Amino acid sequence: MLYPDITDETQWVPMVIHELVHGCQDSHPNHFIARQSIEYQVHEIDLSAYPSQYPWLCDALVEENNCLLEAISADDESEMNGFIRDFLSYRKERKERMYSEFGEVIVKQEEAFETAESLARFMEVQSALLVNSSNPNYTEDSFYFCEDVQEDYFFITGYNLVRLFIKMGVDLDFPYHSTEHRALESYIGID
């Protein structure tokens, strides 16, 4: 067994749902084509460790994620849009530095991982809430799922982007119909 210490089905169900979402994502031929267009140089686990290795990256991701959390909790559209603009500005700046230091391939790889993990993580948490999971981390706004960018950062930012998209009324089926690679934030449309 992969996780022998997990014997409670309320913890297994969310993990299974997470992986099923990946299967659904790749069942869209256009999305599969877009994912195959990415060159993968580092393993997902290695890339998720970059914030621990590069303090400037961790700091930038915290700034981005804080903007996402503020946008999600904003009381009105104007306030939300201000935080979204800040997020997009921080993200653009960080990606430019990543492009300079790590290369375009790593940036695109991050974007592909974030897109893949965003909806999978969101559905994992939602299914955990539905089955009343015994795992204390399964709350919609837990530190583990919403803020811990030093570990699995593209899971965190992707999850929070999906939460923002739901608040904004963005169709969650968006990335699965294009054969072209696009960053998840490119689906944000604000005035």
Can you describe what each PLM-predicted range is?
Residues 14-27:
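Active-site recognition of the HExxH zinc-binding catalytic motif
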Residues 27-102, 106-136:
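Post-HExxH zinc-binding segment in Zn-dependent metallohydrolases
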Residues 89-191:
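Pan-zinc metallopeptidase signature
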Residues 5-8, 26, 46, 59, ...:
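Acidic-enriched, low-complexity/disordered segments with a strong bias for Aspartate over Glutamate
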Residues 1-16:
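Short pre-active-site segment immediately N-terminal to the catalytic Zn-binding motif
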